[in-house]
């Protein structure tokens, strides 16, 4: 939990392996540490910087511009490399925008939604002029209220001079200086997390994780809701992880921490959509304002091809969305229909 007027620094490999000195200068141990950039770069100093500080979040430097599919790939790369549990994951969007502000906004929103779907609170970081020129930040706030972290330095003398505050709606944190390192102040209290109390304790042995209830029993061959999350335990009481489960003729997916997935999930190279009960959806899926099609055979999302549904043919874009104006070199047999 961070409160109004708390301070923190954000760090990357630029700050080196030893950040104890700048933490002491700042008078805090709070950090937001860079994890990744694009889909290949990882901060080589990450482990050391995490060990020396108290991370309140992590950030990813985006290179996806206005490409939603690339934003999804970058978000997944970011999520796959989060080293420890935190509340906030940050989209650092300050370079390589496309010339289309709406496309940029859509890509940012998709990235942030994947962060939210994974159980984190998404934050948008940039500076005011760049944001006003390239992103509709009000759309971001409509979906993720109070999610902005904005840089604005004024005299950049190391002090938080509110005469130079970059006034915008929805700012949670302000990066007020980069001299001699990035300095930040919290403007809004964290909301209290309402996490259900668990009625037992997680245990681990050489075979995996299991859950010991307070009365000494443990779940097996069943679903169990623990801390507001559903898990499935096998016949020996071990939690299933990173695998598909067929139960009552429906398919479910358990994440690497055992939690049942709802919403979108990337398994291997394929996207799937799970409903609110966790069951895999086939056929048409309406998500936000877009339509997607999941195959009846395997449930994977169709992309960059025509599909036949009912009496009509539909074209699904490379990001899986139903095309408004399908483009093709050879019209398939049958009627082309666009919803």
Swiss-Prot record:
Entry's EC annotation: 3.2.1.17
UniProt Cell wall-binding repeat ranges: 200-219, 220-239, 241-260, 261-280, 281-300, 303-322
Active site: 10, 92, 94
Positions of the Ch-type lysozyme domain: 5-201
Catalytic activity from the UniProt record: Hydrolysis of (1->4)-beta-linkages between N-acetylmuramic acid and N-acetyl-D-glucosamine residues in a peptidoglycan and between N-acetyl-D-glucosamine residues in chitodextrins
Keywords: Antimicrobial, Bacteriolytic enzyme, Glycosidase, Hydrolase, Repeat
PROSITE patterns hit by this protein: CW, GLYCOSYL_HYDROL_F25_1, GLYCOSYL_HYDROL_F25_2
GO biological process: cell wall macromolecule catabolic process; defense response to bacterium; killing of cells of another organism; peptidoglycan catabolic process
Record keyword Cell cycle present: no
Pfam families in alphabetical order: Choline_bind_1, Choline_bind_3, Glyco_hydro_25
Domain of life from the UniProt record: Viruses
Group of enzyme by EC: hydrolase
UniProt cross-references to CDD domains, sorted A to Z: GH25_Cpl1-like
Molecular functions (GO terms): lysozyme activity
Family membership: Belongs to the glycosyl hydrolase 25 family.
Function, in words: Responsible for the separation of the host daughter cells at the end of cell division and participates in the liberation of progeny bacteriophage into the medium. Strictly depends on the presence of choline-containing cell walls for activity.
Domain comment, as recorded: The C-terminal domain comprising the repeats is involved in choline binding.
Name the record gives this protein: Lysozyme
Native organism: Streptococcus phage Cp-9 (Bacteriophage Cp-9)
